[in-house]
Amino acid sequence: TETIVETAFGSDYAGMEIHAAAEKWSSDYVKEYRETNLEFAKEFESGEPSGGVFNWENQLNGYFSGRHEDIVSYTVYNYIYSGGAHGTTTEVAVNMNRNTGKLVNEADFFIPGYREALSGILSSHLRDALPDQESYDALFVKDIEPNGNFKLSEEGITYIYGQYEIGPYYLGIIKVTIPWDELGDLVREHI
């Protein structure tokens, strides 16, 4: 749970029990909101034009998102709006060996020298991950690379690309799934 706490709430909450971290994170967020908006509230009450945004939102959800053999994936979803044109959404996956509790990253999961082959497979599935050709044409890059943010399922491995990472904001989070049978010998045995 230590890794989940740090992924969900940040390094300031590392080492805390999950419920205590959630409570502190929530209270810290309210404190930040009050401190940030106090001056704007005073301006508003006095009738002066205020540049402040009083409508803040922060949604944080975590869930088990899949598994493959002994590896389980836990995903943390976060939407934040604290003013501006739009909010920001992030989705980060953490993979763990359920028998040992050890974190499993790309280098653990794939054989040495995997990046080039995996990049080609990811790129070949990118168009299928988008709703239409217009969305595909809007991407910043079409030859994508593994970014370390992946989750496992019965269907395959899914890479998660954040807003602005490979495409414009309006495309949102882009998820590219590769079926297990296409990964061939790239995956290590007995992780």
Where are these regions (language model features)?
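Compositionally biased intrinsically disordered regions enriched in Thr/Gly
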Residues: T1-I191
